[in-house]
Amino acid sequence: MPRDGTLTRNKIMDVAQNMVLDVGLSGASVEKVIDEADVTKSTFFYHFKTKHDLAAALIERYATDDRHHYEDAMEKAEQLSRDPLQQLLIFVGLFIEMTDKLEEPFPGCLYAAYCYQSGAISIDIMSTIKEMMLLWRARVSET
């Protein structure tokens, strides 16, 4: 089976995301990520040229997953009711169920972790977060 580096890239991202949620973006140094992911420095920099590139990849992955969760929940709510108010209540209920199933330690919100340190985050990363918040608002207001 050919190696394309996807597993290693995902491992680095998983470690970095957990670290950012635990100690913030500033506390998640490249060196700490390298150590915890058990990869070489050259491997890290093969996948991410800078810490900013890693941060951007993390938020893009998080936003993609968030978008899928959101759309799945909204689709289910729309299938269960035609009434917009009921759809909204079902949608909120689905998210409550999802959060009730989370096990400690709770993963946290990458958007919030980044926004706490917005001065250390680039405009493009903040734009991704803003885009997702606007998507949520627009989609809920359609209901």
Where are the language model's segments positioned?
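N-terminal intrinsically disordered/low-complexity leader segments
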Residues: 1-7
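Amphipathic, non-transmembrane alpha-helical scaffold segments
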Residues: 5, 13, 59, 63, ...
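Helix-turn-helix
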Residues: 11, 15, 19-61
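N-terminal helix-turn-helix DNA-binding core of bacterial DNA-binding proteins
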Residues: 24, 34, 102-103, 127, ...
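Solvent-exposed, charged/polar functional surfaces in cytosolic regulatory/catalytic domains
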Residues: 36, 61, 65-76, 94, ...
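Hydrophobic alpha-helical connector segments
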Residues: 57, 72-106
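Amphipathic alpha-helical packing segments from all-alpha helical-bundle domains
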Residues: 67-68, 86-93, 106, 119-143
